[in-house]
């Protein structure tokens, strides 16, 4: 009995339809979730909240972000919010979360894409650059007003906002709060899988 030959063009067409359908579903889901999250977050927002030094505080941690919360995966959005506060460009956290909701990794359960952070900063008038070469981090950081140090390791990742103390080589760390240097940050995270730096002027 002769076997029917498989029409490779039909197979490719079906696969493309499936892929494009999945992409469309993911996009629609992201948009829907961001709208729902914004409505929930906006109801609880208090304009009196200033700089956020800890995303795990009771009045912050339960804000919705993707399918998770700010306390779990919102360090990127918090870094953006804090820069806007420091620059007196007060933007409500729910608005920033809504913008970041379109740049999530796996519906926000893995945080925010660095490129989304970068595009947000540039859109709001900052000279922001993303760097991968760790050997240049120290020099680049000294020429920047703010830095966002990004690391990813076995136990997860974090976006740490660093504010340059212009009279020294030290930085004020926000979320978590403290004083550090770029060399200390690199040494502390030397065994992480990913180390990136966003410089902001």
What are these regions (language model features)?
Residues 2-105:
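Active-site-adjacent structural segments surrounding the nucleophilic cysteine of cysteine proteases
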Residues 84-201:
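Conserved active-site-adjacent core of cysteine acyl-enzyme catalytic domains
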